[in-house]
């Protein structure tokens, strides 16, 4: 069973995907888009982003394979962050605040990123102002299986 754990965004080609995946066009937007995510993952797996157009970031829990699949749209319009705690727990979300509020998050300033920001006036790459907190880069996905980051592709 696939469960949507986190979702933020809008799928622009939802009508086409509903027809291809056998989803009712009459569902409310939130329910419809979550159903699209589940069916697209079941149908295309990690290649699901190749079929979706829009701005989105999400996390799906694949109960059968005991893994979390996180994906960010190719343009990076919607953010997605992740953080591994000292005990190996993955914290994730579409806002930094959500992650900061969870047990195990350490608020440690990433001084290197602050220095880069003050020099370049933007934050480049996957690092953030908090040590250990990473951005999932645009068009990339993260697989977390059995308490271990398997890949960021």
Regions found by a protein language model. Give the residues of each.
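Cysteine-centered catalytic environments shared across enzyme families
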Residues: 1-153
